[in-house]
Amino acid sequence: MEFPDLGKHCSEKTCKQLDFLPVKCDACKQDFCKDHFTYAAHKCPFAFQKDVHVPVCPLCNTPIPVKKGQIPDVVVGDHIDRDCDSHPGKKKEKIFTYRCSKEGCKKKEMLQMSCAQCHGNFCIQHRHPLDHSCRHGSRPTIKAGCSPVTASESKPSGDPHPGSWRAVPATQVLVHPAHVNAVTSVWGAAALGW
């Protein structure tokens, strides 16, 4: 051999392999081959000095200090039970926080349902403008396709045709100003019995 001093034998008692590129353990300062250079592979007695892991709380993401000899899982569990600010069992949040603005209604909802016209907060039952008697502007808003007067409101006493369209007085129907003359002539004809 030309280079008798080249390389070192592995310090692992069961190996003793001659390695030309040995790795020195930074904890115990001994030389090892590629198979035994890790702390676990050669059972390094000083590994605890170098193998330091700081556990992090999964709820609040804060590092938890662990003393030597303590089990990290137990320490993190104690932190969650006692010190953690993000523990879901400690703080009790109200789920139903949005109260209905309709007078006389005491329902609360999980989600905010506000009226696009009056910007009030309402429950599911009163969320539509007609359901909460929305007064945006001077008169109640009526959506297209909705009847302005319900059948129960269109039955004046002494009407010969209950529930008919003639039973509704002209003052209750919202009409475009251009059609006022046509409507009054129809109502006049209805009053005459035509």
Curated annotation (Swiss-Prot):
Signal peptide: none annotated. Zn(2+) 1 binds at C10, C15, C33, H36. The keyword 4Fe-4S does not apply. The keyword Metal-binding applies. Pfam families: zf-AN1 (PF01428), zf-C2H2_ZFAND2 (PF25403). It comes from the Eukaryota. A zinc finger (AN1-type) spans 4-52, 94-142. One of its GO terms (molecular function) is zinc ion binding. Zn(2+) 3 binds at C100, C105, C123, H126. SUPFAM superfamilies: AN1-like Zinc finger. GO terms for cellular component: endoplasmic reticulum; nucleus. It is found in: Cytoplasm; Nucleus. GO terms for biological process: proteasome-mediated ubiquitin-dependent protein catabolic process; protein targeting to ER. Zn(2+) 4 binds at C115, C118, H132, C134. PANTHER family: AN1-TYPE ZINC FINGER PROTEIN 2A, ARSENITE INDUCUBLE RNA ASSOCIATED PROTEIN AIP-1-RELATED. This is AN1-type zinc finger protein 2A.
